[in-house]
Amino acid sequence: MAKLLALSLSFCFLLFGTCFALRDQPQQNECQLEHLNALKPDNRIKSEGGLIETWNPSNKQFACAGVALSRATLQPNSLLQTFLHQRSPEIFIQQGNGYFGMVFPGCVETFEEPRESEQGEGSKFSDSHQKVNRFREGDIIAVPTGVVFWMFNDQDTPVIAVSLIDTSSFQNQLDQMPRRFYLAGNHEQEFLRYQQEGSEEEENEGGNIFSGFKRDFLEDALNVNRRIVNKLQGRNEDEEKGAIVKVKGGLSITTPPEKEPRQKRGSRQEEDEDEDEKRQPHRHSRQDEDEDEKRQPHHHSRGGSKSQRDNGFEETICTARLHQNIGSSSSPDIYNPQAGRIKTVTSFDLQALRFLKLSAEFGSLHKNAMFVPHYNLNANSILYALKGRARLLYALNCKGNSVFDGELEAGRALIVPQNFAIAAKSLSDRFSYVAFKTNDRALINVCQKKLLQLLSIWKEMRPGSSSSTAPFHFLFHPAVTQTTKQQLDLVPNQYE
């Protein structure tokens, strides 16, 4: 009897497992892509202080990668209103400088502004908030799930921020459609129109998380008057100002003074970069590393690549470093004065990326320079062109078929699934891009090294074929072509 009961339970578990497998079956076929396209935003929502553009997350390419992409443009003296996300966005600052802040539940307000009291009995704090950070062009900002986020442009030039949202994150308990939960304002959802296409749902009238509450209830719950409740719910706005609003008179932020404005320092480096690289090869010095370390908190090195385990004294979420610069002005990981540079950031460099399970890569190529064929070992890659255009950008699927052969120009995005081989050649004086990776420790493998190994094995197995020329031809920048040919000749000679 006991054996019969155990056998029955086994069949039940097998039946349930089969049902769950059938339910997940459609998602397993989303990456059977025969053709890729360089996509541009297909939805635009204008606001008082800027606009937000989005790509369709239901597109087969984005569904394969499990991500959503958006681009926000903030005009001078404009504020991206506070919101929280059910997923963790990774934001790249394409252009501009400004401030951003996050509100972590349970963390104390450590920035306080003293003010003399009218009676002269000392000082009292009139304003306090959690830490506010300064961002600049080329920064990667990690926003943990459920954390309130805002951004402000205090400069005279627009700010352009590109955001990647991991729709397949394990922290998401809703469906795959991205949603922003705003805490203020009266505006519509950026991605909601994709969900409403083909349905007869009500028009998206906008609002925030307080709009549905009754005013009497909010007055008692928040201990505020009716005027503040109306502003909180956006009732006093004659028209929808949107998610980005103009700040009359500027925004007062309590921050420590800086010795030198970062935006001026970054702009000078970018202006001198082209001339320095053309005049002579740049020799990376310890002074450059020291300058970057001064701009970054010293606790950055505590979670370095020496150890993957926490020792109990790692940075807490309240004091975690949430942004790092990977732009042209930072020290590159790969550098060739005649070809270009590449800079990456992973959870080894920025520990906050562990919460997002995302990483990023910034690349800049000179004209006619090539990024050799390579593929991502453990991540999907979302390429977004920042400047210029690239030609001969190939992507090969598991069948060896070319799924993309064309140009990628500024403002367009291309999804490169895991293990799809890809190569790029710059057609502009400078082609720059940012690649979002769906792994906080993403790795790439260059196909050239694999070909060298295969060629060596082939020569070893067939010693008599050493006199024949190798049938492999690569397109490289002229400065490295001769070196590569020497490598191809030297490796087989070891087995002759």
Curated annotation (Swiss-Prot):
Signal peptide start and end residues: 1-21
Chain intervals for the UniProt region annotation (Disordered): 240-311
Gene3D superfamilies attached to this UniProt entry: Jelly Rolls
InterPro entries according to UniProt: 11S_seedstore_CS (IPR022379), 11S_seedstore_pln (IPR006044), Cupin_1 (IPR006045), RmlC-like_jellyroll (IPR014710), RmlC_Cupin_sf (IPR011051), Seed_Storage-Functional (IPR050253)
Swiss-Prot/TrEMBL keywords: Alpha-amylase inhibitor, Disulfide bond, Seed storage protein, Signal, Storage protein
GO molecular function, one term: nutrient reservoir activity
Pfam families linked: Cupin_1
Biased composition (Basic and acidic residues): 257-269
Keyword Hydrolase among UniProt keywords: no
Functional note: Seed storage protein. Alpha-amylase inhibitor.
Subunit organization: Hexamer; each subunit is composed of an acidic and a basic chain derived from a single precursor and linked by a disulfide bond.
Protein's recorded name: Legumin
Organism of provenance: Cicer arietinum
Source species taxonomy: Eukaryota, Viridiplantae, Streptophyta, Embryophyta, Tracheophyta
Gene name in the database record: leg3
